[in-house]
């Protein structure tokens, strides 16, 4: 009967609604559905308990995965997750703007139509000249937003050694922090 108990940090509140675990802190809130057969996840006072009646390799690995997800949620609502990105161009000066819940890149390789991508979840995108900072409490939403921005400037059918324009991830969060 494997059982893992995770201590809830002081400034964090955790609630359970059926299969969903919601963690709230100073930096926001994150909700995640944690379900797997024969694994129970519950909030018991100031701890989150992950337990199972089964004792096989798949169940043990899933318990470890759930433990990592919950630790990432705790880290996200207390300190947050942050990606650093940099705008690089050599041919045409591109402009990167945030309009509502979208990131808009104009004049990429001289294109007339702007390229757009959505900002996921509670993620904030800040632009300071050629530097972008993507931050928020949910590691998956922050990472997906950064990846979408990077993929938005992907160049096809041209020599990537010559056309190096784009927005690139230059700094990732240290996942060992959680």
Curated annotation (Swiss-Prot):
Organism superkingdom: Archaea
Q: Which Gene Ontology MF annotations are present?
A: rRNA binding; structural constituent of ribosome
Looking up Gene3D superfamilies in the UniProt record yields: Ribosomal protein L6, alpha-beta domain
Q: What GO cellular component term, any one, is given? A: cytosolic large ribosomal subunit
Keyword entries, A-Z: Ribonucleoprotein, Ribosomal protein, RNA-binding, rRNA-binding
- SUPFAM superfamilies reported for this sequence: Ribosomal protein L6 (SSF56053)
Q: Might you name a Gene Ontology BP term for this protein? A: cytoplasmic translation
Which is an annotated Pfam family here? Ribosomal_L6
Quaternary structure annotation from Swiss-Prot or TrEMBL:
Part of the 50S ribosomal subunit. Interacts weakly with protein L13.
Q: State the protein's purpose.
A: This protein binds to the 23S rRNA, and is important in its secondary structure. It is located near the subunit interface in the base of the L7/L12 stalk, and near the tRNA binding site of the peptidyltransferase center.
Q: Which family does it belong to?
A: Belongs to the universal ribosomal protein uL6 family.
The protein here is known as Large ribosomal subunit protein uL6
Tell me the organism. Haloarcula marismortui (strain ATCC 43049 / DSM 3752 / JCM 8966 / VKM B-1809)
The taxonomic lineage of its organism, from the top, reads:
Archaea, Methanobacteriati, Methanobacteriota, Stenosarchaea group, Halobacteria
């Amino acid at each position: 009967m494997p059982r893992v108990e995770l201590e809830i940090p002081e400034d964090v509140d955790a609630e359970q609604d059926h299969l969903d675990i919601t963690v709230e802190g100073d930096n926001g809130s994150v909700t995640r559905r944690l379900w797997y057969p024969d694994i129970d996840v519950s909030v018991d006072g100031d701890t989150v308990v992950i337990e199972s009646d089964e004792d096989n390799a798949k169940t043990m690995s899933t318990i470890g995965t759930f433990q990592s997800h919950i630790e990432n949620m705790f880290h996200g609502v207390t300190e947050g997750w942050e990606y650093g990105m940099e705008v690089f161009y050599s041919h045409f000066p591109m402009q990167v703007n945030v309009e509502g819940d979208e990131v808009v890149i104009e004049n990429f390789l001289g294109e007339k139509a702007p390229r757009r991508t959505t900002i996921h979840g509670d993620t904030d995108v800040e632009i300071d000249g050629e530097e972008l900072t993507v931050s928020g409490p949910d590691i998956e939403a922050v990472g997906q937003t950064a990846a979408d921005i990077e993929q938005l400037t992907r160049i096809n059918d041209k020599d990537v050694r010559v056309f190096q324009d784009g927005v690139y991830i230059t700094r990732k969060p240290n996942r060992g922090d959680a």
